[in-house]
Amino acid sequence: MAGTASAREALGRFGEELAAQHLQTLGMTILARNWRCRSGELDIVARDGYTLVVCEVKTRRGVGFGEPLESVTPRKAARLRQLAVAWLTEHAATRVDTTEGTHGYTAVRFDVVAILHRKEDGPTIEYVRGAF
């Protein structure tokens, strides 16, 4: 059983690394990965211009338990919103430095990166901007 948990954790780390790289290629700056508080964890927190992006990463090896995106339920979305408030509270002094000066965030967006990593095909990435 420990081997299975270990394999799941390794798959999750792989997916989060792939997702972070994908977001960076889109021009985002990664601010935090696996940020934790008492209420839970945010996979990736990034900056996209003046927008704070909270990104949930779902990685699966197959679709036997459903597509990766299907696991982001309304309940999960509500929890991520609460965690985003906690992150913003903890990082109240965080500002976005730009060529025009220093500004706060003007919006928060919730994105999802779903990765299906089948051995025969390699990983495929589905990115949903503003998923909820």
UniProtKB/Swiss-Prot annotation:
Supply the source organism for this entry. Acidothermus cellulolyticus (strain ATCC 43068 / DSM 8971 / 11B)
The protein's matches in HAMAP family, at most eight in alphabetical order, are given as: UPF0102 (MF_00048)
Q: Which NCBIfam families match?
A: PRK12497.1-3, PRK12497.3-3
Which PANTHER family does the UniProt entry name for this protein? UPF0102 PROTEIN YRAN
GO MF terms, alphabetically ordered: nucleic acid binding
User: What is the name of this protein?
Assistant: UPF0102 protein Acel_1550
Q: Which Gene3D superfamilies would you find in this protein's record? A: 3.40.1350.10
- Family listed: Belongs to the UPF0102 family.
Its lineage reads:
Bacteria, Bacillati, Actinomycetota, Actinomycetes, Acidothermales
